[in-house]
Amino acid sequence: SEANIDAIPFQHELLDQWRFNFKGVQFEDKKRGFLWFGAIDDVWIHNQSKKLIIADYKATSKKTEVNLDADWQIAYKRQMEFYQWLMRSNGFEVDDEGWFVYCNGKVFDNHFNGSLSFDIKMIPYKGNDAWIEPSLERLIKCLNAIVIPDANENCNYCKYINKINLATDF
């Protein structure tokens, strides 16, 4: 391929489970008393280093070329890093570089004819899962707190919930 990835699909007896929503790659975190999981799309193994490569598939349909530059796509990057962390937590050696296989539907060709074509772009991403452990600690602390924390003014989800509460407050 034009991405020149020196890897082949990884074969593992749990691969189908790893891809299944609500099952996925699981890590029993005995230190915190939690089961963390995430459903991956694909895993490759590098032919030289033998490190695993996480591949995540994305699909969209837009006129512009796909990339990972939008602010909201930090969620995609965090998702990739979490998958890398899960696999490492299960004892696998995982490459920091993962791949997004981004499919962009060509609906702007002015013809449909019962089929849809895609442009496929391979986007490398060098993950860094250093944020995960401290985030899990904060998450556990929040869950165990007696007092609910104040909404974060920079959190779009918090803003959304506040608007719902205002709209339904009688």
Question: Which sequence ranges carry the predicted segments?
Answer:
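A non-catalytic, helix-rich entry segment at domain boundaries
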Residues: 1-23
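Short, structured coil/loop segments at alpha-helix boundaries
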Residues: 4-8, 73, 82, 152-155
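Mg2+/Mn2+-dependent nuclease catalytic core
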Residues: 20-134
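Polybasic (Lys/Arg-rich)
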Residues: 121-159
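Short functional micro-motifs and their immediate structural scaffolds
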Residues: 163
